[in-house]
Amino acid sequence: RRAIRHGYRLGQKQPFFYQLVEDLSKVMGQAYPELIAAKARVAAVLQQEEERFAETLEHGMQVLEGALSRKIKVLDGETAFRLYDTFGFPLDLTADIGRERGITIDHAGFEQAMARQREQARAANKFTMQEGIEYSGSQTTFYGYETLQHEGQDLAIYKQGSAVDFIEAGDEAVVVLDQTPFYAESGGQVGDSGELLAANGTFAVADTQKIQAGVFGHKGLLRSGRLVIKDTVLAKVNPLTRTSTANNHSATHLLHAALRQVLGNHVTQKGSLVDANRARFDFSHNAPLTADEIRETERLVNEQIRHNWVVESATMKYDDAIKRGAMALFGEKYTDVVRVIGMGEFSTELCGGTHVPQVGQIGLFKIVTESGVAAGIRRIEAVTGTAAIDYVQQREAQLLEIAHTLKTSPQEVTQKIAQIIDNVRQTEKELTRLKTKLASSQGADLAAQAQDVKGIKVLAVNLENADAK
């Protein structure tokens, strides 16, 4: 960006930096052959970044010029941070520009603004159920990989963030169990819902979150009776939502592997959200997917579903998992021992989530949307199983309705629409021709109405529906 900015100062307003990739690959290609293999993609990404930064550079320079024009000796940290946060100006770039004008940067103020934003981001990312909850007891043992029902004891109950000894019907609370089959939200997979059945009460679990590492909080409402500390409960996960969520989670693993085959090995997962309704998958790629790429991705995923691979899970040391080719998510923190999920030879990933026993259970995979969420990050939303069938049937119903409106068959809708568009264009051309003809005939009559004003013929008249041309 500093190089681009210097080029900008020299009058180079078009992207230029990406052109160096060709020369770099010639000089360094023998030592780094992967650079030659990837040079087209590297150049494309660099060009895209240059084009984006050129836009922000122009707007950012206006802000910076406005601040520097105030005859100051020190640029305040808030302005420097705004340039960094909003326009992508690294602090050293702002410092370079200031140095040229004899102006220094308030580094301390910049760091304060940066620290404030980090704190706000941390606060926004905390689960709401964590607020005010202080727990110092034993951790929760998770049995949800093996079963959807398990007996446990409530170690703590929190009402409105405060620890209590019991709750009664109608109370909302967070219950901590020593053992549970409920999956707590993590890794992009939402927490389980279900119920806790005690001898004297029924607690409806709406969500499950980690209130600490290894401590599961079951958030919900006591529907009836009374729940007391140390009560033994039968924890029952809602099987329908768990199954649908597992379908979608396993589908994201297949999707990840398929995208790497279709688009290239540069594709890596950048985020996900998996619930009972759909799967959302963010990944690294610098361009929208074409219709053919989407179709090929869907074909590959559904082909694996038909293979009905057994989903295998194993725990092993992190280094061993990576040696076996397991995909690890960039930026994710892993322990020394990790859980590996394999789906035939098609997909192997590190994952702590819940999955189907065999991929055939997914049934059907259908991409609903593909969009961009940030520079170099694309997002796919997809549905599986019954939801995918419902989606296809809804689209089929829409097509039938359109065909009925156009008085044609579904197979000929595209041809019919093209015909209508062509007819409209022809009608517009004919209308223009008739207007021109009418104006010409009117013009001949109007010419006779011109008045002589001091030797100049003048005609003033109001024409309805006349083309200004």
Where on the chain are the PLM-derived regions?
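A glycine- and charged-residue-rich anion-binding loop/surface
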Residues: 1-469
